A protein has these predicted regions:
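WD40-repeat beta-propeller superdomains and closely related acidic/aromatic-rich repeat-like regions
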Residues: 1-225
Length: 225
């Protein structure tokens, strides 16, 4: 059954928002949100430059450089990821009730020789039917998350760092790219070549595409009664 089962946040947060938006991650942890309808009107009406300003200017909840930003399929918000192995889930509605629903969490970390190693989250992708999302990291892991339950649904372990992720339009498959992003120590030959923690080297000759089934893997888990 491929029917949507995504249940957005409850309370005063809108259940759906059909405003066409463009969300841009800027330098300095800034996030600009544009209303595409307003931009279209400004273009065709010959409006002054001030009309092309973002509808919202925000500061990211994450403390370090952003790596990716993705909008929720129901239009109510977006998620950002950072080089510090954290993800933030935020909402366009500026009311206090809606903003109280935003949150951030850490992921894509593991202990290596007694040290907590943090990996960047290079890419994310929202499932078009369920509203769950995937995060692809430099630790060669892809995690599937339920943003409502705030839990991980599933995790894949790939051979080398992940650089891109995308669900197809029907949500049947998840495509992952590995090997294109790697730390500097992966750029040399020898037995020690590879990512921190023994992850396989990226770079030329290691780029691969991985196709994962998504209709069942990305479906939110039913709540226990």
């Amino acid at each position: 059954d491929a029917s949507p089962v995504y249940a957005p946040m409850t309370g005063a947060v809108p259940l759906e928002d059909d405003t066409p938006r463009l969300v841009v991650a800027m330098a300095g942890r800034a996030v600009h949100v544009y209303d595409l309808r307003a931009l279209r009107h400004a273009i065709y009406s010959g409006a002054p430059e001030s009309a092309f300003a973002p509808a919202q200017r925000r500061e990211s909840s994450l403390k370090f450089m952003l790596r990716d930003v993705r909008c929720m399929p129901d239009g109510t918000g977006y998620a950002t990821s950072s080089v510090e192995g954290r993800i933030a889930v935020e909402f366009f509605d500026t009311s206090a009730a809606a903003q109280a629903q935003k949150y951030a969490f850490k992921c894509h970390r593991r202990e290596v020789d007694g040290v907590d190693v943090v990996y960047p989250i290079h890419a994310m992708a929202f499932h078009p039917l369920y509203g769950t999302f995937a995060s692809a990291g430099g630790d060669a892991h892809c995690a599937l998350w339920d943003p409502v339950a705030k839990k991980r649904i599933r995790q894949y372990v790939l051979p080398s760092p992940l650089s891109a992720a995308c669900f197809n339009a029907t949500g049947e498959v998840l495509a992952l790219a590995s090997g294109a992003v790697n730390l500097e120590d992966a750029n040399h030959d020898g037995p020690d070549a590879g990512e921190v923690g023994g992850i396989g080297a990226g770079g030329h000759g290691h780029v691969k595409l991985h196709i994962k089934p998504a209709l069942e893997d990305a479906k939110p888990k039913a709540k226990a009664r």
